[in-house]
């Protein structure tokens, strides 16, 4: 009987704990960004749903990757463009990357990307034109907004409905992250993301880093002009990028210092790099068969991401030629035209389980565009890389991994078949690359809390407390001259100059007095002698 009396309250306690968990449940509005950005954001949303929160996802009817089968409320709105329009504009942008890579905001502005960005930003106007949806959002009494800041619509929604926001991002162009969080970023050792410099810059690189920083301030307003015009129209007041980004409660940054260079951070910046890494699952039979057939040489995984569907024919043939000269089996995720010189060791697939393949012990190398998702999966699984960055932060990611000895970077526009062949043989045969990536993997995994759990905690924190004002620095309330202490410097300089002036005047007066008295004595002495 005593034993029964001891165990009987256990189910009741469990029920009470579960009840408490759901009593804490809140209401979250999610404004995601289309494309690969949604993949990892979705994992956070799904975990929040499992924890009992009421989640509402707002997305345009026209999208590539946005998932409508989530176990939550999904609200869609029509757009002024079709999926064909979106695909056409993106293909223009993607093809341009095979001709010239943007290494500054000005070059990005002058490229064909501006048309795609204008179309991309325009969907926010469509959201607010849907008065029924806006009224629903207004009456829903959300606790917070969970958003991707590259799509400024989430920031506009947060400001329009006066809701605390949790931002989910790898980084943002134009120093909007640093300015929005009021986080110092010394140009002497914090390189611009588009330049691909390390934190140990030469004098020439530091000069160029300053020039590009000034260029950002001059031209970023034009790159995001359409987005800011839409924001001003919706909010019915002139809006700057700082106005949108500066009200962020928590920044969930998909980075980690095994990839990022050490730099200043703010208390509302939470690092969740590697959130997309998962425990490897058993491979589909098709891929298991490829690996078994590869023998002792193993495999190489090749993917340039979900957004690159085709490569110019000449470049694709050069790549195929290089792949045919290594003994490994190459699994190439590619949906474009099959290169005519494709070797027997190279298998084209429309899709591959990238993380699961990278986690297989027979995987020898990873050919990647150095997107943050692929780079972190490579770090988590300890696979050295050959990196062929195309746009955005990819050049920066590649430089960081190369600096840490975890891979080789190739200029995809200039590389030859021989360059790719040599790079592959280097990362496969030189043990230092494997040792370096394994060291980074060990550092990355040595953490007290998993990135997904950390992200979920901070979203819930903002929901519970209606923001995180205690983490907001007073720098937001200062003018530019107060922030840089120019008024204090001016005051102290004025004091020093005043003291120096008074001291000089006193010395001059004393000197004149002494000299004048001495002169009168001499004159009196001369008159007596005469």
Swiss-Prot record:
Quaternary organization: Homodimer. Homooligomer. Interacts with UGT1A1, UGT1A3, UGT1A4, UGT1A6, UGT1A7, UGT1A8 and UGT1A9 to form heterodimers. Isoform 1 interacts with isoform 2/i2 suggesting that oligomerization is involved in negative regulation of transferase activity by isoform 2. Isoform 1 also interacts with respective i2 isoforms of UGT1A1, UGT1A3, UGT1A4, UGT1A6, UGT1A7, UGT1A8 and UGT1A9.
Predominant location: endoplasmic reticulum
GO MF annotation list: enzyme binding; enzyme inhibitor activity; glucuronosyltransferase activity; protein heterodimerization activity; protein homodimerization activity; protein kinase C binding
Tissue specificity: Liver and colon. Isoform 1 and isoform 2 are expressed in colon, esophagus and small intestine; isoform 2 but not isoform 1 is expressed in liver or kidney.
Catalytic activity annotation: glucuronate acceptor + UDP-alpha-D-glucuronate = acceptor beta-D-glucuronoside + UDP + H(+); 17beta-estradiol + UDP-alpha-D-glucuronate = 17beta-estradiol 3-O-(beta-D-glucuronate) + UDP + H(+); 17beta-estradiol + UDP-alpha-D-glucuronate = 17beta-estradiol 17-O-(beta-D-glucuronate) + UDP + H(+); 17alpha-estradiol + UDP-alpha-D-glucuronate = 17alpha-estradiol 3-O-(beta-D-glucuronate) + UDP + H(+)
Entry keywords, A to Z: Endoplasmic reticulum, Glycoprotein, Glycosyltransferase, Lipid metabolism, Membrane, Signal, Transferase, Transmembrane, Transmembrane helix
TM annotation in the entry: 488-504
UniProt-reported outcome of changing residue 93 to V/L/I: Loss of estrone and 16alpha-hydroxyestrone glucuronosyltransferase activity
Name by which UniProt lists this protein: UDP-glucuronosyltransferase 1A10
Record-stated family: Belongs to the UDP-glycosyltransferase family.
Enzyme nomenclature, EC number: 2.4.1.17
